[in-house]
Amino acid sequence: MIATFGWVLNGGTIHKKDLGGGTILGLGIYNIQLAQMVFGGETPTVVASGHMGEDGVDESNSTTLIYKNGRTATLISHSRVELNNEVCTYLFN
């Protein structure tokens, strides 16, 4: 599964640290929730990286959730770049 979710956000709470801002909490959580629904709530291994902006909150992140039997979810969210905002799932035996 690959999911992208992001667009240019100039304002609101997403870039305000004192208001709990950040791309993972504001946007990325939806990708995570979808992956958990697709893979049945199984606890994955998490590999993640991101970029902290001048405001002290994460502006982008890329996360890979690794599930049993070689299943993965690659999740990307960004608050400074317009992404495709789509999900692709792949089935294999």
List where the protein language model places each region.
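Contiguous beta-strand/loop segments that form the cofactor/metal-binding neighborhood of enzyme cores
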Residues: 33-93
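Predominantly a Rossmann-like dinucleotide-binding segment in NAD(P)-dependent oxidoreductases
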Residues: 1-49, 54
